[in-house]
């Protein structure tokens, strides 16, 4: 019980850390809920987010809560991860670089009863973080210049508690219940060199608190003692969020200093989409595991508050065509030559993955950015005098986010996750 209390303290600490960080520098995070997070742990990230069909006794796979029933009965698992990334932004021949590092997740799991596993943790849902400007002239003789400044920060996190049960041999079901919270604060400033033109600022903000429920199913089909296939499926409930969005328009006369502001509020402004996922994992002798995943986030039926000004008639209202359904396809796997071998290199898990995702944003009537990514990494066992089951998960990931009409992003990311796998529940025999 003391060790479980320590783990809970660690989880609270990492929760507070996560609340203070943003995991992106992308200008695309100025739209919608921001840049959607992968919601994967260290071993998933090396396979580019693959996991709906995976069942691991020594890893926490919160992509599918049905997998918790496979947790080893003698251990308590605690897994936390961080990432660092370098992104190159390019548009119309202009290129910029930006660095970013962030806390990613902290999760834990243990066997509650026979064929029943429990997991809890904190994972990101979305990230908002950008700061850039654009300048030019409003007339051909270049006598009046302008500077437009775009800033934003925020994001959403979720704390979950999940359970996985294997009621029938080779059939597991599970559920994750999550509390989600977060906010976003965005601003657009328009400043002019001509003192007769008022400067204009727009401020968008929201504070969101809601819940999320995700279900999972896994069916393992053994062909013989060395080969099997696990089929996985997930479903997440969609529902309205009873929180408001606010937009404030501030006009400033630079000659007199007089300010005029107008505030708009949209009630019940948000909604979580339904999510559907399916996956398959082929397992050969617990050495080679390869799989494919497909996921669908039904954003198209989700409105979002948008400010518009048509010939001086300003409004802040829900746009029913703001989002698009997001489809993601993932392929990957891992190979471990000999998990219990005396040769160190044979005990390492070698992982790879690739994925393609369609955009979930509809920006000014045009498709937002699609995403292509590949990854590779290692699961390195950590040896000490009392435990050889903990794992250091390291992976590298390249992500290309682009659209024909907008900025292209190329991101190189390093992910580091440390899985503590302790034998807390072993009964020691005294002779």
Identify the residue ranges that each predicted region occupies.
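N-terminal, post-signal peptide beta-strand-biased segments of exported outer-membrane/organellar beta-barrel
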Residues: 16-124, 325
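Bacterial Sec-dependent N-terminal signal peptides
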Residues: 1-25, 431
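Outer-membrane beta-barrel porins/channels
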Residues: 21-46, 111-431
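Residue-level detector of alpha-helical transmembrane segments in integral membrane proteins
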Residues: 10, 58, 266-267
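Single-residue recognition of alpha-helix boundary sites
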Residues: 13-14, 75, 180, 297
